[in-house]
């Protein structure tokens, strides 16, 4: 993997983080009108249906250019398996996140971003090498998370968010495994259908929201479904093809910074001094993990 492709992947994932950051505000507003599981199920179906024409048009363009290669039965099986696995992990993570988002957009995002710790830890069990600078960046990220959240006793919504960060780490590693093997748009589409089916099935037992309530949070659903799901999660799958899961998770954890900024700009939530410092430290962690190792080695050679 070249430095150019790694940079490309990082930039795509930073854009993903921006889109996700704003989605915390939409989720926070949306769950005021309908149940968290209903919100997550509906937005997932919206994201899935939005991706169908994208997948079709992409294939038609390839056919027209003569670059289309019909997938084998094995590739289709891998795509379906990947979509189901990613969907189950994402369903668990995003549902827990939506259930805990009433902790506030900024706090929710930064607790969720603890997946930057779980990804390299889980990666060790998968025999993935993690550079020392990444562990330093992870520690910086944890310090940033502490500052942004402050000293607090865990509430139920915060427990939901910590659990969701664990499953987001599982989702990132699952995407890392399947994304190089299959079409990214199709993988994203299938995973959202899986999320929608699971959550909407649960919704039938918990209570179906009224049409009026769904319409009242229509704007939040549109952003969360089209932008956060269809666009951002597809960008995640594409971006992770060009970077390691640990570096990718650190780039995506910038969503916490953008969530705080979105809460400030859209909801008028004023940033406290410790929150600003925390944002800066998390951003520094993202930059650190992207610095090539060669820079430090060359500097040491010059000094000697």
Task: Identify what each model region corresponds to.
Residues 5-10, 33-41, 72-79, 150-170, ...:
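Juxtamembrane helix-entry segments on the extracytoplasmic side of multipass membrane proteins
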Residues 51, 130-150, 168, 199, ...:
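Hydrophobic transmembrane alpha-helices of multi-pass small-molecule transport proteins
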Residues 23-24, 58-111, 145-147, 225-243:
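Specific transmembrane alpha-helical segments of multi-pass solute transporters/efflux pumps
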Residues 1-42, 88, 92, 96, ...:
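Glycine-/small-residue-enriched transmembrane alpha-helix faces in small-molecule transporters
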Residues 25, 37, 47-51, 119-120, ...:
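Transmembrane alpha-helical segments that form core, pore/gating elements
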Residues 42, 108-114, 175-196, 229-265:
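Helix-helix packing/entry segments at the starts of transmembrane helices
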Residues 2, 44-45, 59, 217-219, ...:
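C-terminal-most transmembrane helix of multi-pass membrane proteins
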């Amino acid at each position: 993997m070249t430095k150019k492709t790694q940079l490309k992947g990082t930039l795509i994932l930073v854009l993903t983080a921006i889109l996700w950051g704003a989605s915390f505000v939409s989720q926070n507003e949306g769950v005021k009108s309908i149940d968290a599981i209903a919100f997550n199920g509906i937005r997932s179906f919206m994201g899935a249906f939005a991706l169908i024409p994208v997948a079709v048009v992409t294939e038609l363009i390839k056919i027209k250019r003569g670059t289309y290669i019909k997938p084998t039965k094995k590739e289709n099986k891998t795509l379906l398996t990947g979509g189901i696995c990613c969907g189950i992990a994402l369903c668990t993570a995003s549902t827990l996140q939506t259930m805990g988002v009433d902790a506030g957009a900024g706090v929710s995002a930064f607790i969720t971003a603890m997946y930057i710790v779980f990804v390299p830890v889980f990666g060790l069990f998968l025999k993935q090498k993690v550079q020392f600078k990444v562990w330093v960046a992870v520690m910086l990220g944890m310090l940033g998370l502490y500052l942004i959240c402050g000293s607090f006793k865990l509430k139920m919504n915060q427990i939901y968010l910590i659990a969701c960060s664990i499953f987001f780490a599982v989702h990132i590693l699952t995407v890392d495994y399947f994304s190089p093997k299959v079409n990214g748009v199709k993988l994203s589409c299938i995973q959202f259908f899986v999320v929608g089916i699971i959550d909407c099935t649960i919704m039938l037992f918990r209570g179906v929201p009224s049409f009026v309530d769904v319409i009242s949070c229509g704007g939040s659903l549109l952003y969360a479904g089209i932008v956060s799901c269809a666009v951002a999660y597809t960008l995640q799958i594409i971006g992770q093809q060009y970077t390691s899961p640990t570096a990718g998770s650190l780039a995506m954890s910038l969503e916490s910074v953008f969530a705080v900024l979105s809460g400030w700009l859209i909801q008028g939530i004023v940033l406290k001094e410790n929150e600003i410092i925390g944002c800066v430290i998390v951003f520094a962690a993202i930059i650190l993990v992207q610095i090539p190792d060669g820079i430090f080695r060359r500097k040491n050679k010059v000094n000697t």
